[in-house]
């Protein structure tokens, strides 16, 4: 396991904690964790990236301690445009003009949003477990995928949201238990990852992220309105992109990420990993790392 080198930067809204690893002079690769997860999920992939000569920047996303909001009055807004702006703010604070981005789940959605809104900042883009959604528009899926999204619908009723507030760790554990074939994690790893899940901001960001997709009148943060409008205008991405999908992903049906090539003007490829579920970077880190390294090398 790579040594944790935890650092802090301040932005207008956040104190962002991030792990900085690999050669200091290596080309930067930003690794964005998903939900429910934490930066430690990238440990094995990060080691391989370091061995290839690159530097990794692995932030704790908003809501995930030790990242924290500077003001209690800031809306706990969990939309991808906010997460993308956080990533840009972090890159600006570190003086990174361009970087490769690799994201899983929420991190994948954030990576696509970066590709839509800030393509000039990206050298390459890898997205794990979530297919691209043109214009950032959420549509109610077919009944099969809607069944998989039960956890999103639960959050959209007040009683469900209250149940999650009472036991966020238990709620997260159900996802780990059911989104992949069994046997991919142990109790110690889940416990270490879930340390931040009881934080009130983790719960607030979780609920806002999902409720704002489907529930009218959910709290938003108006400072991101212009980014949201721009996102709705972007259908095609130009950044060289790799999509990695587990063939046994029981959260996001693999068919949801098929046949998306037409939305990419740059190079695009999709890698389907047999026997792998929703957490490819944890379940098959060597395959993921090798694919990401090839992407970054080919992107130049």
Predicted regions and their residues:
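Hydrophobic residues on the short alpha-helix immediately C-terminal to a glycine-rich phosphate/catalytic loop
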Residues: 45, 114, 291-295
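Flexible "cap/lid" subdomain of the alpha/beta-hydrolase fold that forms the substrate-access gate
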Residues: 2-4, 15-16, 28, 64-98, ...
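Conserved HGGG/HGGXW glycine-rich cap/lid loop of the alpha/beta-hydrolase fold
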Residues: 19-69
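A short loop-to-beta-strand scaffold at the N-terminal edge of the catalytic core in hydrolase folds
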Residues: 11-20
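Catalytic active-site module of serine/aspartate enzymes centered on a nucleophile-bearing elbow/loop
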Residues: 267-300
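Glycosyltransferase donor-binding loop in the core domain
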Residues: 37, 198, 249, 277-280
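Conserved acidic functional residues
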Residues: 34, 105, 282
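Conserved beta-strand scaffold positions in the cores of enzyme catalytic domains, especially
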Residues: 6-8, 56-58, 243, 270-272
